[in-house]
Amino acid sequence: MDALEITQKLISYPTITPKECGIFEYIKSLFPTFKTLECGENGVKNLFLYRIFNPPKEHTEEKHAKESVKPLHFCFAGHIDVVPPGNHWQSDPFKPIIKEGFLYGRGAQDMKGGVGAFLSASLNFNPKTPFMLSVLLTSDEEGPGIFGTRLMLEKLKEKDLLPHMAIVAEPTCEKILGDSIKIGRRGSINGKLILKGTQGHVAYPQKCQNPIDALASVLPLISGVHLDDGDEYFDPSKLVITNLHAGLGANNVTPASVEIIFNARHSLKTTKESLKEYLEKVLKNAPHTLELESSSSPFITASHSKLASVLKENILKTCHTTPLLNTKGGTSDARFFSAHGIEVVEFGVINDRIHAIDERVSLKELELLEKVFLGVLENLSEK
């Protein structure tokens, strides 16, 4: 089965996060020679398929768990859940159609196209040396992500089945297939700042302490500020205000407080602690409360790593383009792999229609992506 056929089947399952809708039974049926592990909580389901090719005669699974020298273990990872499709589609979002060289359907780009490509590549892979191949899929990536990939990796750690390397098939490309590989991601810190004052009548300002006056002085030091200068792969860390509220809606009452909600997408150079230190310094003369919560940590895989190098080689060979290595965009499940010390990168189709009405993927992209993934497997098994 090729990537197109598998992707069409995957799209036909209405797996709006965190629903799995039986899609894992279909995927398992494609891999009768692979062993399976499944886990999940709170309506989330996760699937791990794995096979050790060409194990030494004395090899057993028990020995695999104990021996210090193991076959290289490579994992393809992704999610089968999708965001709600919304209205105004030209066709049923869960009945895939092909039109003018594109496959239409919810998840075509994010990320059932990528999953279809790596499932097809895995089916066509036949190494001649000892090699361990696995597939990790979750129904909880578009949602909170608490019981998805993170949970499955913890289970794999308990069983000593963590991979050495992984590719997460997120739609990373911008204009043409092969133009972008994510070798890391920025971290994300959420914050709430409350500037405190004294509510009162606008006609008696001497009896009020208007927190908006304090806001006016500190706002230029908070809104849009660069927290560091970034580096070759990370943009400068930046604080962005997402919501600001003050007052009762009356024109003759000064507010008792101003609430500011913000987010900081940050590189390895900025931490929650350094952000707190900066903000407390800026706010030292303003009565306030400050809450910070890190929702994800930044990470990076070395640009010269074996995995990144092999992937670049196959993109150049198949797509005839040299990819840009970067960390742009939001968070992804790749961060959970990195937290376990796993060499991880992200690569997939173009992302111009993700989460959009009439989401689609080019048929040519699916064909080329499958070839890239198969080439990566073949090269890794040879080295």
UniProtKB/Swiss-Prot annotation:
Keywords: Amino-acid biosynthesis, Cobalt, Diaminopimelate biosynthesis, Hydrolase, Lysine biosynthesis, Metal-binding, Zinc. Zn(2+) 1 binds at residues 79, 110, 170. Binds 2 Zn(2+) or Co(2+) ions per subunit. It comes from Helicobacter pylori (strain Shi470). Its EC number is 3.5.1.18. InterPro entries: ArgE/DapE_CS, Bact_exopeptidase_dim_dom, DapE_proteobac, Peptidase_M20, Peptidase_M20_dimer, Peptidase_M20A. This is Succinyl-diaminopimelate desuccinylase. Gene3D superfamilies: Zn peptidases. It is an enzyme of class 3 (hydrolase). It catalyses: N-succinyl-(2S,6S)-2,6-diaminopimelate + H2O = (2S,6S)-2,6-diaminopimelate + succinate. One of its GO terms (biological process) is L-arginine biosynthetic process.
